């Protein structure tokens, strides 16, 4: 496995391996969820590139850019075990050199859920991912479904801008107690870590009510919210039932309905989601 920091060097590698690369974009501080993407990437292409870049343009004012966990040596160990050929780890000045002024925005699908509470977030995501696609030239790129809206936004971007690649969404990987794996979990105190289980428990409660015959979104929202509110300190950013394709709101739920939520536990904002009809 090699580590590349230069855009020019990464582009040269990509030219030599064109049509044979799978890309796993990450912000680093890798965990088993990331590793599962890399293992799957290994099955889909001759060469696997994992990008590690804490992208400043997707963080808003007073968000956790400066405190986002970073450990390249740790990341190299996990990536190597997962079969990665190249880590592309540029610095911000490589991706956004002096005078940089071009951004890409997907309008409607990015405007709600995380986009409503994090203005500019998805503009930063789509811009950096489009740049990675141009630099690495993958035939396939893999993303986790924990960031369900991000996946939907990127699918729309790929379609609208005619990127010649496949986007693959992979299932959420969870800890043994149900918490969705996230690099931000390491920022939780032991007490906060226990409280964070309210996200997966609220999903389980809503799905149980759905299996019991409840189809009213308003009623299902009350069931799910009650679990989180019962923990007192966690703060709900959003808890929504949406069409999984358009992400538009619904009045009645069915098996394809997406339950997506964002909850702040202490200073840490966590997200989770599930499709009501899936186990």
UniProtKB/Swiss-Prot annotation:
Q: Which GO terms describe its cellular component?
A: cytosol
Q: What organism is this sequence from?
A: Citrifermentans bemidjiense (strain ATCC BAA-1014 / DSM 16622 / JCM 12645 / Bem)
Q: What interactions and quaternary structure are annotated?
A: Homodimer.
As recorded in UniProt, coiled-coil segments are: none
The places in or outside the cell where this protein is found are: Cytoplasm
Binding-site residues for ATP, renumbered to this chain: 27-34, 144-147, 173, 181-184
Quick one: a GO biological-process term for this protein?
A: pantothenate biosynthetic process
Location (main, coarse) = cytoplasm
**The keyword Cytoplasm is annotated on this UniProt entry:** yes
List of catalytic residues = 34
GO terms of molecular function: ATP binding; pantoate-beta-alanine ligase activity
The root-end lineage is: Bacteria, Pseudomonadati, Thermodesulfobacteriota, Desulfuromonadia, Geobacterales
Disulfide cysteine pairs (residue numbers): none
According to its UniProt entry, the function of this protein is described as: Catalyzes the condensation of pantoate with beta-alanine in an ATP-dependent reaction via a pantoyl-adenylate intermediate.
Give the binding site residues for beta-alanine.
Answer: 58
- This enzyme's EC code(s): 6.3.2.1
Give the reactions, separated by semicolons, that this protein catalyses.
(R)-pantoate + beta-alanine + ATP = (R)-pantothenate + AMP + diphosphate + H(+)
Question: What PANTHER family does the database record attribute to this sequence?
Answer: CYTIDYLATE KINASE/PANTOATE-BETA-ALANINE LIGASE (PTHR21299), PANTOATE--BETA-ALANINE LIGASE (PTHR21299:SF1)
Q: Which gene encodes it?
A: panC
Sorted keywords for this record are:
ATP-binding, Cytoplasm, Ligase, Nucleotide-binding, Pantothenate biosynthesis
UniProt lists the family membership as follows: Belongs to the pantothenate synthetase family.
Listed Gene3D superfamilies: HUPs (3.40.50.620), Pantoate-beta-alanine ligase, C-terminal domain (3.30.1300.10)
This chain belongs to which protein, by name?
A: Pantothenate synthetase
**Superkingdom:** Bacteria
């Amino acid at each position: 496995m090699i580590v590349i920091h230069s855009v020019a060097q990464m582009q040269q590698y990509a030219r030599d391996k064109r049509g044979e690369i799978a890309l796993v974009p990450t912000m680093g501080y890798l965990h088993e969820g990331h590793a599962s993407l890399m293992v799957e990437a290994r099955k889909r292409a001759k060469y696997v590139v994992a990008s590690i870049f804490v992208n400043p343009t997707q963080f808003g004012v007073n968000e956790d850019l400066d405190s986002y966990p970073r450990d390249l040596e740790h990341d190299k160990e996990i990536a190597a075990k997962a079969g990665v050929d190249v880590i592309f780890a540029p610095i911000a000045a490589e991706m956004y050199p002096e005078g940089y002024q071009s951004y890409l925005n997907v309008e409607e699908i990015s405007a709600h859920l995380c986009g409503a509470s994090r203005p500019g977030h998805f503009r930063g995501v789509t811009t950096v991912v489009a740049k990675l696609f141009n630099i690495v030239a993958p035939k396939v790129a893999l993303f986790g479904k924990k960031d369900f809206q991000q996946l939907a936004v990127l699918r729309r971007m790929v379609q609208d801008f005619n990127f010649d690649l496949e986007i693959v969404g992979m299932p959420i990987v969870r800890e043994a107690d149900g918490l969705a794996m996230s690099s931000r979990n390491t920022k939780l105190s032991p007490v906060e870590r226990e409280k964070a289980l309210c996200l997966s428990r609220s999903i389980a409660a809503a799905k149980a009510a759905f299996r019991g015959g409840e189809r009213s979104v308003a009623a299902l929202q009350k069931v799910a919210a009650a679990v989180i509110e019962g923990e007192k300190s966690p703060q709900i950013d959003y808890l929504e039932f949406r069409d999984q394709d358009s992400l538009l709101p619904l009045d009645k739920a069915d098996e394809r309905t997406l339950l997506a939520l964002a909850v702040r536990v202490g200073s840490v904002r966590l997200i989770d989601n599930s499709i009501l009809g899936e186990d």
